[in-house]
């Protein structure tokens, strides 16, 4: 599965391959493109989904852990996103912590 290019602009708008997928607000709330609250990303890296509770954590070193599946991937400094099972799955431009949280919510919600 290739996620394509995911971008988060300075206002927090999240796009994938040019299509608006949601927004990350300054308080860490993640809203879908129709403004429905789908989750929250805390400053400590914990990620919570409205539907499923805590879905994971993004560590400072870029490791992505899912509460359901354990260590699922890595965010590299160059923005490359790797899945342990599938290899390179995408490219990210922007804040890695934010997109890490969004990606876990993305797998869970979209």
Task: Identify the function of each model-found stretch.
Residues 39:
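Catalytic zinc-binding patch centered on the HExxH motif and its immediate surroundings
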Residues 49-50:
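Extended, low-complexity, charged alpha-helical tracts
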Residues 1-21, 26-28, 36, 44, ...:
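Long terminal segments
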């Amino acid at each position: 599965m290739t996620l394509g290019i995911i971008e988060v602009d300075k206002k927090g708008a999240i796009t994938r391959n040019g299509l608006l997928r949601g927004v990350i607000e300054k308080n860490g709330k993640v809203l879908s493109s129709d403004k429905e609250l789908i989750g929250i990303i805390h400053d400590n890296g914990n990620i919570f989904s409205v539907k499923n509770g805590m879905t994971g954590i993004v560590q400072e070193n870029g490791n992505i852990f899912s509460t359901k599946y354990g260590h699922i991937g890595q965010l590299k400094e160059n923005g490359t996103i790797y899945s342990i099972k599938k290899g390179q799955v995408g490219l990210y431009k922007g804040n890695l912590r934010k997109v890490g949280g969004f990606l876990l919510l993305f797998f869970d919600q979209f």
